[in-house]
Protein backbone atom coordinates (compact mmCIF):
# COMPACT_ATOMS: atom_id res chain seq x y z
CA UNK A 1 0.00 0.00 0.00
CA UNK A 2 1.52 3.41 -0.93
CA UNK A 3 2.10 5.91 1.85
CA UNK A 4 -0.75 8.42 2.33
CA UNK A 5 0.99 11.20 0.39
CA UNK A 6 1.72 8.95 -2.60
CA UNK A 7 -1.78 7.49 -2.48
CA UNK A 8 -3.29 10.97 -2.71
CA UNK A 9 -1.08 11.77 -5.71
CA UNK A 10 -2.00 8.46 -7.38
CA UNK A 11 -5.73 9.07 -6.96
CA UNK A 12 -5.48 12.64 -8.24
CA UNK A 13 -3.33 11.54 -11.19
CA UNK A 14 -5.83 8.87 -12.24
CA UNK A 15 -8.83 11.12 -11.76
CA UNK A 16 -7.38 13.99 -13.82
CA UNK A 17 -5.63 12.35 -16.75
CA UNK A 18 -2.14 12.71 -15.30
CA UNK A 19 -2.56 16.22 -13.90
CA UNK A 20 -1.84 16.85 -10.22
CA UNK A 21 -1.53 19.95 -8.10
CA UNK A 22 0.44 20.89 -5.04
CA UNK A 23 4.10 19.91 -4.93
CA UNK A 24 3.95 18.11 -8.30
CA UNK A 25 1.96 20.74 -10.19
CA UNK A 26 3.39 21.16 -13.68
CA UNK A 27 5.70 18.17 -13.30
CA UNK A 28 6.04 15.33 -15.79
CA UNK A 29 4.83 12.33 -13.81
CA UNK A 30 4.29 8.63 -14.36
CA UNK A 31 2.71 5.97 -12.19
CA UNK A 32 4.90 2.88 -12.05
CA UNK A 33 3.37 -0.39 -10.88
CA UNK A 34 6.16 -2.80 -10.05
CA UNK A 35 6.17 -6.30 -8.60
CA UNK A 36 7.45 -6.42 -5.03
CA UNK A 37 10.88 -8.02 -4.84
CA UNK A 38 10.04 -9.80 -1.59
CA UNK A 39 6.25 -10.01 -1.61
CA UNK A 40 5.40 -10.41 -5.30
CA UNK A 41 2.56 -7.93 -4.73
CA UNK A 42 1.92 -4.98 -7.06
CA UNK A 43 3.30 -1.67 -5.83
CA UNK A 44 2.35 1.66 -7.44
CA UNK A 45 4.33 4.86 -6.97
CA UNK A 46 4.43 8.28 -8.69
CA UNK A 47 7.78 9.07 -10.28
CA UNK A 48 9.03 12.05 -12.27
CA UNK A 49 10.34 11.31 -15.75
CA UNK A 50 12.14 12.80 -18.72
CA UNK A 51 11.32 12.26 -22.39
CA UNK A 52 14.15 10.73 -24.39
CA UNK A 53 13.28 11.63 -27.97
CA UNK A 54 11.60 8.35 -28.85
CA UNK A 55 9.54 5.59 -27.30
CA UNK A 56 11.53 5.13 -24.12
CA UNK A 57 11.34 7.44 -21.12
CA UNK A 58 13.82 7.96 -18.30
CA UNK A 59 13.29 7.87 -14.54
CA UNK A 60 15.80 8.68 -11.81
CA UNK A 61 15.94 6.64 -8.60
CA UNK A 62 16.88 9.57 -6.38
CA UNK A 63 14.69 8.94 -3.32
CA UNK A 64 15.42 12.58 -2.52
CA UNK A 65 19.08 11.79 -1.94
CA UNK A 66 18.35 9.14 0.71
CA UNK A 67 21.11 6.64 1.58
CA UNK A 68 19.14 3.72 0.09
CA UNK A 69 17.63 3.18 -3.33
CA UNK A 70 13.82 3.56 -3.43
CA UNK A 71 11.72 0.42 -3.14
CA UNK A 72 10.49 0.67 -6.72
CA UNK A 73 14.08 0.47 -7.95
CA UNK A 74 14.75 -2.70 -5.94
CA UNK A 75 11.54 -4.14 -7.37
CA UNK A 76 12.68 -3.41 -10.94
CA UNK A 77 16.01 -5.08 -10.34
CA UNK A 78 14.18 -8.24 -9.31
CA UNK A 79 11.34 -7.97 -11.86
CA UNK A 80 12.11 -5.58 -14.76
CA UNK A 81 8.63 -5.86 -16.31
CA UNK A 82 6.25 -3.17 -15.02
CA UNK A 83 3.07 -1.26 -15.87
CA UNK A 84 3.35 2.42 -16.75
CA UNK A 85 0.54 5.01 -16.61
CA UNK A 86 1.29 8.39 -18.17
CA UNK A 87 -2.18 9.90 -17.83
CA UNK A 88 -3.12 9.03 -21.41
CA UNK A 89 -1.80 5.54 -22.07
CA UNK A 90 -1.40 2.48 -19.88
CA UNK A 91 1.27 0.09 -21.11
CA UNK A 92 3.71 -2.62 -20.15
CA UNK A 93 7.41 -1.80 -20.23
CA UNK A 94 10.78 -3.33 -19.48
CA UNK A 95 13.13 -1.42 -17.19
CA UNK A 96 16.82 -1.21 -18.09
CA UNK A 97 19.29 0.37 -15.67
CA UNK A 98 21.67 2.56 -17.68
CA UNK A 99 25.33 1.61 -17.73
CA UNK A 100 27.76 4.10 -16.12
CA UNK A 101 28.78 6.06 -19.23
CA UNK A 102 25.23 6.53 -20.51
CA UNK A 103 23.96 7.11 -16.99
CA UNK A 104 26.45 9.92 -16.44
CA UNK A 105 25.52 11.62 -19.72
CA UNK A 106 21.79 11.40 -19.04
CA UNK A 107 22.16 12.48 -15.42
CA UNK A 108 24.17 15.51 -16.53
CA UNK A 109 21.36 16.36 -18.94
CA UNK A 110 18.85 16.11 -16.08
CA UNK A 111 21.01 18.29 -13.81
CA UNK A 112 21.22 20.91 -16.55
CA UNK A 113 17.41 20.94 -16.66
CA UNK A 114 16.96 20.84 -12.87
CA UNK A 115 19.94 21.41 -10.52
CA UNK A 116 17.99 19.69 -7.76
CA UNK A 117 19.24 16.34 -9.05
CA UNK A 118 22.82 17.40 -8.27
CA UNK A 119 21.74 18.36 -4.77
CA UNK A 120 20.25 14.90 -4.28
CA UNK A 121 23.45 13.26 -5.50
CA UNK A 122 25.53 15.41 -3.15
CA UNK A 123 23.49 14.16 -0.17
CA UNK A 124 24.28 10.47 -0.68
CA UNK A 125 27.31 8.24 -1.22
CA UNK A 126 25.42 5.98 -3.63
CA UNK A 127 25.43 6.70 -7.35
CA UNK A 128 21.82 7.61 -8.14
CA UNK A 129 20.66 5.23 -10.89
CA UNK A 130 18.91 6.24 -14.08
CA UNK A 131 16.45 3.75 -15.58
CA UNK A 132 15.12 3.60 -19.14
CA UNK A 133 11.58 2.29 -19.56
CA UNK A 134 11.09 0.53 -22.91
CA UNK A 135 7.43 -0.03 -23.92
CA UNK A 136 6.54 -3.59 -24.90
CA UNK A 137 5.15 -3.70 -28.47
CA UNK A 138 1.57 -4.92 -28.62
CA UNK A 139 -0.88 -5.85 -31.33
CA UNK A 140 -3.82 -3.56 -31.86
CA UNK A 141 -4.41 0.00 -30.68
CA UNK A 142 -2.80 1.32 -27.49
CA UNK A 143 -4.66 1.14 -24.19
CA UNK A 144 -5.95 4.68 -23.75
CA UNK A 145 -7.13 5.81 -20.33
CA UNK A 146 -10.61 6.62 -21.65
CA UNK A 147 -14.04 5.04 -21.92
CA UNK A 148 -14.86 6.04 -25.50
CA UNK A 149 -13.30 7.27 -28.72
CA UNK A 150 -14.54 10.78 -27.97
CA UNK A 151 -13.00 10.78 -24.52
CA UNK A 152 -9.78 9.30 -25.91
CA UNK A 153 -9.45 12.09 -28.46
CA UNK A 154 -9.88 14.74 -25.78
CA UNK A 155 -7.46 13.01 -23.39
CA UNK A 156 -4.75 12.80 -26.05
CA UNK A 157 -5.28 16.40 -27.15
CA UNK A 158 -5.12 17.65 -23.56
CA UNK A 159 -1.83 15.81 -23.07
CA UNK A 160 -0.34 17.61 -26.07
CA UNK A 161 -1.66 20.92 -24.75
CA UNK A 162 -0.10 20.26 -21.36
CA UNK A 163 3.27 19.24 -22.81
CA UNK A 164 3.36 22.28 -25.06
CA UNK A 165 2.66 24.52 -22.06
CA UNK A 166 5.57 22.91 -20.21
CA UNK A 167 7.90 23.40 -23.16
CA UNK A 168 6.85 27.04 -23.53
CA UNK A 169 7.55 27.55 -19.83
CA UNK A 170 10.97 25.91 -20.17
CA UNK A 171 11.84 28.06 -23.17
CA UNK A 172 10.67 31.19 -21.38
CA UNK A 173 13.02 30.34 -18.51
CA UNK A 174 15.91 30.01 -20.98
CA UNK A 175 15.15 33.12 -23.03
CA UNK A 176 15.28 36.70 -21.79
CA UNK A 177 12.55 39.22 -22.46
CA UNK A 178 14.72 40.83 -25.15
CA UNK A 179 15.00 37.53 -27.05
CA UNK A 180 18.47 36.65 -25.77
CA UNK A 181 19.47 33.76 -23.59
CA UNK A 182 19.07 34.42 -19.88
CA UNK A 183 22.56 34.62 -18.30
CA UNK A 184 23.45 31.35 -16.62
CA UNK A 185 20.47 29.49 -18.09
CA UNK A 186 21.54 27.51 -21.17
CA UNK A 187 19.23 26.30 -23.87
CA UNK A 188 19.78 22.83 -22.53
CA UNK A 189 20.06 19.40 -24.05
CA UNK A 190 16.97 18.08 -22.23
CA UNK A 191 14.85 20.96 -23.51
CA UNK A 192 15.93 20.04 -27.02
CA UNK A 193 14.96 16.42 -26.37
CA UNK A 194 11.58 17.52 -24.99
CA UNK A 195 10.92 19.44 -28.22
CA UNK A 196 11.95 16.54 -30.45
CA UNK A 197 9.79 14.13 -28.45
CA UNK A 198 6.77 16.42 -28.81
CA UNK A 199 7.38 16.73 -32.55
CA UNK A 200 7.51 12.97 -32.97
CA UNK A 201 4.43 12.45 -30.82
CA UNK A 202 2.36 14.91 -32.82
CA UNK A 203 3.53 13.34 -36.08
CA UNK A 204 2.51 9.89 -34.83
CA UNK A 205 -0.87 11.18 -33.62
CA UNK A 206 -1.75 12.89 -36.88
CA UNK A 207 -0.60 9.89 -38.92
CA UNK A 208 -2.80 7.64 -36.79
CA UNK A 209 -5.79 9.91 -37.28
CA UNK A 210 -5.39 9.97 -41.05
CA UNK A 211 -5.05 6.19 -41.23
CA UNK A 212 -7.73 5.37 -38.66
CA UNK A 213 -10.39 7.72 -37.37
CA UNK A 214 -10.64 9.96 -40.46
CA UNK A 215 -11.47 7.12 -42.92
CA UNK A 216 -13.90 5.64 -40.37
CA UNK A 217 -15.78 8.92 -40.00
CA UNK A 218 -15.68 9.64 -43.74
CA UNK A 219 -17.44 6.32 -44.42
CA UNK A 220 -20.10 6.93 -41.77
CA UNK A 221 -20.57 10.67 -42.29
CA UNK A 222 -20.02 11.82 -45.91
CA UNK A 223 -21.18 15.30 -44.89
CA UNK A 224 -17.97 15.58 -42.83
CA UNK A 225 -15.75 15.58 -45.96
CA UNK A 226 -15.11 19.38 -46.01
CA UNK A 227 -14.11 19.36 -42.34
CA UNK A 228 -11.82 16.35 -42.80
CA UNK A 229 -10.21 18.02 -45.80
CA UNK A 230 -9.54 21.10 -43.67
CA UNK A 231 -8.08 18.97 -40.88
CA UNK A 232 -5.74 17.25 -43.32
CA UNK A 233 -4.55 20.63 -44.61
CA UNK A 234 -3.95 21.73 -41.04
CA UNK A 235 -1.96 18.54 -40.42
CA UNK A 236 0.26 19.49 -43.35
CA UNK A 237 0.75 22.99 -41.98
CA UNK A 238 1.56 21.71 -38.50
CA UNK A 239 4.01 19.21 -40.01
CA UNK A 240 5.84 22.16 -41.61
CA UNK A 241 6.02 23.96 -38.26
CA UNK A 242 7.26 20.81 -36.54
CA UNK A 243 9.99 20.36 -39.12
CA UNK A 244 11.11 23.96 -38.64
CA UNK A 245 11.24 23.39 -34.88
CA UNK A 246 13.16 20.12 -35.32
CA UNK A 247 15.78 21.83 -37.46
CA UNK A 248 16.14 24.71 -35.03
CA UNK A 249 16.68 22.59 -31.92
CA UNK A 250 18.95 20.13 -33.77
CA UNK A 251 21.52 22.87 -34.40
CA UNK A 252 24.67 23.17 -32.35
CA UNK A 253 23.91 24.95 -29.09
CA UNK A 254 26.13 27.91 -29.96
CA UNK A 255 24.34 28.36 -33.29
CA UNK A 256 20.84 28.25 -31.83
CA UNK A 257 18.97 31.54 -31.64
CA UNK A 258 16.81 31.00 -28.53
CA UNK A 259 14.55 33.95 -29.33
CA UNK A 260 13.84 32.54 -32.77
CA UNK A 261 13.10 29.09 -31.36
CA UNK A 262 10.75 30.57 -28.76
CA UNK A 263 8.86 32.39 -31.51
CA UNK A 264 8.53 29.08 -33.37
CA UNK A 265 7.16 27.43 -30.23
CA UNK A 266 4.67 30.28 -29.81
CA UNK A 267 3.53 30.01 -33.44
CA UNK A 268 3.16 26.23 -33.15
CA UNK A 269 1.16 26.69 -29.95
CA UNK A 270 -1.26 29.14 -31.54
CA UNK A 271 -1.89 27.05 -34.65
CA UNK A 272 -2.02 23.72 -32.84
CA UNK A 273 -4.48 25.01 -30.22
CA UNK A 274 -6.79 26.27 -32.97
CA UNK A 275 -6.48 22.96 -34.83
CA UNK A 276 -7.22 20.82 -31.77
CA UNK A 277 -10.22 22.93 -30.84
CA UNK A 278 -11.69 22.77 -34.35
CA UNK A 279 -11.10 19.03 -34.55
CA UNK A 280 -12.87 18.47 -31.25
CA UNK A 281 -15.81 20.64 -32.33
CA UNK A 282 -16.19 18.64 -35.54
CA UNK A 283 -15.45 15.09 -34.40
CA UNK A 284 -16.49 14.67 -30.78
CA UNK A 285 -20.24 15.12 -31.39
CA UNK A 286 -20.10 12.35 -34.01
CA UNK A 287 -17.97 10.11 -31.81
CA UNK A 288 -20.48 10.44 -28.97
CA UNK A 289 -23.52 9.79 -31.16
CA UNK A 290 -25.40 6.45 -30.95
CA UNK A 291 -23.52 3.76 -32.81
CA UNK A 292 -20.09 5.26 -32.28
CA UNK A 293 -17.70 2.71 -30.82
CA UNK A 294 -14.20 2.76 -29.42
Predicted regions mapped to residue ranges:
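Short, conserved active-site entrance elements at the starts or edges of catalytic domains
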Residues: 2-35
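Glycine-rich, pocket-lining loop/helix-strand segments that form or immediately flank
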Residues: 9, 74-77, 99
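Short beta-strand segments
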Residues: 27-64, 194
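Small-residue-biased structural context
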Residues: 27-30, 56, 85-98, 102-119, ...
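Short beta-turn/strand-loop junction motif enriched in small, turn-promoting residues
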Residues: 35-37, 81, 116-117
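Hydrophobic pocket/interface hotspot
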Residues: 40, 76, 120, 275
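Short, charge-rich binding segments
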Residues: 49-51, 74-75, 84-87
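Compact nucleic-acid interaction/catalytic patches
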Residues: 55-82
Amino acid sequence: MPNPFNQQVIEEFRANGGRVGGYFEGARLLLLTTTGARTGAPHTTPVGYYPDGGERVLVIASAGGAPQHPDWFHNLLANPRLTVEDGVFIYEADAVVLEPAERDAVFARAVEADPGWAEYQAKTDRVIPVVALHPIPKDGPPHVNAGSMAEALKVVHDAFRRELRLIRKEFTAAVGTDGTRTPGVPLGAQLRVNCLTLCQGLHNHHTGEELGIFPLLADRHPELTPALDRLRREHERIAELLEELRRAVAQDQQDTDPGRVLSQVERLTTELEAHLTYEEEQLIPLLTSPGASR
